[in-house]
Each structure stands twice: as structure tokens, then as C-alpha cells.
Amino acid sequence: MALPITDDDLDGLKQPYVTFSSGSASPPQSTTDAMDLEEQVLDAIKSDAFLVDWVGEDDKGNPQNLPYWRKWVITMSLALYALSTTFSSSVFGAATHVLAEEFALPAETVVLGCTSLFMVGFATGPIFWGPFSEAFGRTRPLLAGYLAFAVLQLPIADARSLTSICILRFLGGFFGAAPSSILSGILADIWSPRERGFAMPTVGAFLTIGPILGPLIGSVLVQSVLGWRWIANVVAIASFFIAVFTFPFLPETYTPLLLARRAERMRHMTRNWAYRSKSEEAQSSIGDFAERYLLRPARMLALEPILLMMTLYVSVSFGLLYNFFLAYPTSFIQERGWDQTTASLPLISILVGVIIAGALLSFTTNSRWAPNAKEGRPQETRLLLMMVGAVSLPAGMFLFAWTSSATMNPWPQILSGIPTGFGIHLINMQGMNYIIDSYKIYANSAIAANTFLRSLFAAGFPILATSMYAAIGVKWGTTILALLAVAMIPIPILFYYFGAKIRAKSKWQPPL
């Protein structure tokens, strides 16, 4: 029969071994008894009795139990980080022709250096920021990345060559990717799955609103007495302002790190070194890192039809969004003769479409348009709204293309941005949500692959658009891209009917 293990027994293991002389008053225990006791102590240590976890559902240390107002402060802080970094991704597009004249370079080269390289950095950043957020918690990588992003804006304002701007823009994208890489983890830390249905569309809307505001505000700055260099200064000032007023309200939310800190406190308070958290038991190697953050996302993207096709569709729609940041100014300046600031105002219609789509997603969170296993609605239910967006996007693009003539009233072309923005946001959000629903515990790997490809498309489309619009004009260039959007329509329809069967055959299908 096993002897009961007490803290005194565990404390005994911390003491040095005691040797007995021939004159000892009492003889030592036999070697067998000592070994049996040690085995019992070790078994007790290995048991869950000393495993530190949350104490009940109401544990105040659990980020899920933060006050409701505090959760929304955190959520809106993340939305502001996303807004400022994605704003920076597109804002220099407004200075393309000014920079081309100042540095005597082709417009395509300026687009490559100022917009595309930023998005390449934005694509590579998550490879590092994701692991950092799991190794060091959420707040430290978030703070480090965001502040570095803000600081890197300052030398851009004094840059004397496009090469310097290119390097700084790439680094700005790399560090600016930190909030976008970490925010989904923080939202999962503090919100329940049902509550995330309201929080995620809010942050997602800011991720799309940011790049839309970039050309609008950038055009105003470029045309003002401040000039293009103040674009970087404005981004820096806004980012520092956001950081100062939000970081004091951001607690650490990563559960493994919080439990490890609690276990450390308990060890020091009780002098019982058996207390530990699950994360402290895990041993990670470079091979584990490569598998989790590099190899698995690549394999999933190559072997998973759902991930591959959904990522392709989301990436195309995201690339089309960045394409319009050039299409609108090109059409309204070159074909209608508007000045740059006025020509950027029609982009507001895309913003309106995004806001309408975001509101629709929030209002339908608990409706028949959303998945609900208890009511028999599978993950594929999300694709219903995605189908609506799939039709809306090319419809808006065709309207934009075929009303772009200077002889036609500009309002149809201006208002075409509403169905365009509406469609882009529905495709992006519902596509991402469907990926998360489909892979659950492997969602981080799936989203990493998605983010990488999506950012590369956003980097490539502006270069493509610059050359294409110069060669064949806005009407036919946008028509070709609209046909590409039409070709994507069958994707959500296909997975709506066959997605469940495809998921059942997946190697990465999570257990029920």
C-alpha cells in the first residue's frame, strides 16, 4: 500500500543527503524503503496534484474573466494598431508620381519600393511574430514590433534616395506585421467563441478600412504645403499617440505564460518546487519550431484543397483592394481630369461598402447565416454570405470599368465602390472564418499560410495594375480583373456543397 505523500516528504528531497555514522542513535532506513519512498514522491510530483491551472471558471486570473468593458478596450486598441499599420501600407501610393519625378524613376519602380516591399515585409513578419507571441507572451512582441514600426517612419521623412525608402518600407512592413500577427491570439485569449463573433468583425473592418484611408489622407498631404515627407511623420505621430494611450491598458493574456508565472509564484511562496504549469513541462526544439511555423503551413497549403482555394480567393480579393488604390486616381485624374485630392475621394464609397458588410456580419452572428452545431448548421453555413460577396465584387468592378468614360456622369462610377467594398470584406472575413472553423487546433498554421500569400498578392497587384492601366486603360484593365473575380465565384459554392466531405478526408481534420 502506498504511503501518503506530504509536503514534508517533498521538502525532504530538497535537503542534502544525510550520512549516518556507526554511533548514530537510530539506524537508517533500508535502501529499498528509501527508493520506494522516492518513487512515491516522484509519482506524486508527476501527477496533476501539483499542476497549476485556473481554479474554476471564475478564476480572476483567467483573461476570459476580464470585465466586459476591459475586453472592449483591448479589442479597440488592437483595432487601432491594425488601422495604423495597414494605413501605412497604402498611404505612399498617393505619392507615386511625386516620388517618380523627384528621383527621376519610373512609376512602377516607386510602387515596388513604397507599397510592394512594405507588403513583402508584412508577409514575412508573421513567420517570426507568431512564434514570439507564444514564447514571450502577447504584449512584449506587440509593443516591440509596434514601436519599431513607429520609429522606422522617422528616417523615411529625411530619406534622400529611393533605395533608403525601399529598405525602410520593408522593415516597416516587417515590424508593422506584429499587431496583425498577434491580435487574433489576443482575441481568442479574452473572448469566448460566441463573443468573438462580434469582436472579430470589428477588428477585421479596421484591417480593411486602414488601407482605404491611406490614399485619401496621403493625397491631402502630398497636395498640401507639407509635402510627401510628412506622410511618414503623420504615421509616426499617430502610432506613438496610439501606443501611449493604449499600452497601459493591455494586460498579458497568453494563458500558458500566465500559468507559468503563477506556478513560479507558488514555488517561491511554498518552497515546494513540484508546482509547475503544462507549458513548463513542454520541451521545444528548433525542429518543433520549423515544423509548427514553416513546414506545417507550407504542407497544409499544398495538400489541403479548402485551405488552398480559400487562400487563393481571399488573396485575389485582397490584391484587388490594393489595385483600386491605383485604379481610382488613374481613372479620375487621367480620364476625368480631376485633381489628386478630389480624385481620391471616390474611395470613400469602398469604405462605405466595407462598413455595411461589417455591420451585416455582426448582426448575423447568431442567425441562420452563421454555423451552429446544436441547430444542425455546419461550418459551410458561413459560405452563404461569402457567395453574396462573390457576386457583389465583380458587379461593382464591371460598373466601375464601364462607367469610367469622361463623357459619362461620374456618380455611377463613384458608387460602384459600395458593392466592391461590400464584396471584398465579405469574402475576406468569411473566408478567414471558414478556414479557422475547418482547422480549429491547426488554425494558426492555416492562417499563417493564408496571411503570407495574401500579403504577396497585395504586393504584386499594384505593380500589375500600374503596367496594365498604362497599356490598355482603366476600362479594359478593370474588366480583365473583374473576369478574374467572376472565375472565383464557384469556390464558395463548391465548398458549400462538398466542404464537409472534403474536410472529413483531411489529414488535419481536428477531432470532434
Swiss-Prot record:
One Pfam family hit: MFS_1
InterPro entries: MFS, MFS_dom, MFS_trans_sf
Any one GO molecular-function label of the UniProt entry: transmembrane transporter activity
Keywords for the protein's UniProt record, in alphabetical order: Cell membrane, Membrane, Transmembrane, Transmembrane helix
Membrane topology, from the record: Multi-pass membrane protein
Highest rank taxon of the organism: Eukaryota
UniProt function note: MFS transporter; part of the gene cluster that mediates the biosynthesis of cercosporin, a light-activated, non-host-selective toxin. The perylenequinone chromophore of cercosporin absorbs light energy to attain an electronically-activated triplet state and produces active oxygen species such as the hydroxyl radical, superoxide, hydrogen peroxide or singlet oxygen upon reaction with oxygen molecules. These reactive oxygen species cause damage to various cellular components including lipids, proteins and nucleic acids.
Name of the protein in question: Cercosporin MFS transporter CTB4
Organism from which the protein derives: Cercospora beticola (Sugarbeet leaf spot fungus)
Lineage: Eukaryota, Fungi, Dikarya, Ascomycota, Pezizomycotina
The encoding gene: CTB4
